[in-house]
Amino acid sequence: MFVFRPKDLLPDPVYPADLKELGYFITDNDQIKKISDPEQDFQFKINRNPRWNEAQREAMNACIRTIVHSRLRDQGMTTLRLPLNASPKEPHVPIFISSNLSTAKRVVVVFGEPIQDVGIWAYRSVGMQGINAGSAVSLAQEILHLQKKDDQQQQQQAPESNGKPQHVTSDTALILANTGQLIWHCGGRRAITHASWMALPRRSAVDPPYTMTGRNSIPGNANWQEHVESVFEEVLAAKGRLVREDAKIDIIGISEGGLGAIRYLASDWSSWSPYINAICLASPLHFANIDLNPYDNDNEAEAETETNNQNNPNSFASFLLARGRAYVVSPEPRGVPVPGIEDHGCNCFASGEELNIECVMGAAWKEMVQWFEKVHADPEYCEDQYDVTTVEAEGGVVPEGGVQVVHAGVDNEDDNGGVAIEV
């Protein structure tokens, strides 16, 4: 039997977290392109061995994280550690908060996907559409009402900006939760995602990944559901300290992040109903007949369940139907109603993204912010209920996908007779 000695094993590949050394640069359009071929995006597959590909991707992602976090800080955002009593060297998860959080009348909270780093919508969008477009930078600029920098200035300041953070004058604050970086890397003393954990340096290229133990768990943030609860209970519930007593909260939930928020609010809606203004979901994963009811089996949960239905105007289900909406993958133009209200308990709209679920937020965030403004301006706002069905066209000719007939009404009462939309 042949045995390889450790010194004879392939060394683990190492790539620098530097765009130029990786062979890439930021264009005038804020996109990441190859230096050798300015028309080519990031090339993931550079070797038949997947370990080389993963190591290079993690180095690129580290560059992007540095740039995005630098730009967020330039806009007056800072990091907050959870648990709140954790020191920088103790296990904690960082979230981003705007500097006006304690004084703002409105707070927009974003719960992202567990597969993404904080502040990143999708790495594929960052490379192809632009760093700001694929991250929370554009959203922060819009919500905090900051004057946007031109791409050239941001490029000169990346990856580390020497510019002073802009002063936030808006009465709307922003919180970027961190449902992805929930693994504590003891050696690096930082929280990382599962993808980053798998890309950590190893003794050789053929060694297995490190085994996780209890030391890699973050107290109160062991998974994305716990992290969502931690943001609500440690940050948003800190009335008079971290947020204003009368602050209204808008929630953006992306995939599992939205599912966690829905489950938490459904389990304790009576406590949070005075403060939640509206909910907007990207790629919703909850089901109205399951997740809109509390998932605990104690007496309080049973009492919530009795009142948490659409027939009760004070229930969470009624609130989500009236002041909630979702954006999903669809071939339809952005903003067109699509089927989904029966599954998710709220109106569903096309996001403008046809293929990738992770790209929905980057495509639909502007619509979300505009809708939040509309709902905030009208305390009595109530969404029309869109019943979208697909029917055959007249004469037996059926276009590809059929024809969608959208009925808009309140309390299942049709108020417009239906609008036909070719799909």
Residue spans for each PLM region:
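Intrinsically disordered, low-complexity domain-flanking/linker segments in eukaryotic proteins
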Residues: K148-S170, R189-R215, G240-V243, N297-T307, ...
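Gly/Ala-rich beta-loop-alpha elbow adjacent to hydrolase catalytic centers
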Residues: I249-A261
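Long C-terminal extensions of eukaryotic subunits of large macromolecular complexes
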Residues: M1-S36, G352-V423
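Short, surface-exposed "cap/lid" segments of acyl-processing enzymes
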Residues: L84-R189
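Short glycine-enriched nucleophile-adjacent loop
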Residues: G258-S270
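Alpha/beta-hydrolase active-site loop
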Residues: G134-V137, Q141, L176-V243
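The feature captures the conserved acid-bearing segment of alpha/beta-hydrolase catalytic domains
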Residues: W269-G401
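Basic, amphipathic N-terminal segments that precede the first structured/catalytic domain
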Residues: M1-N100
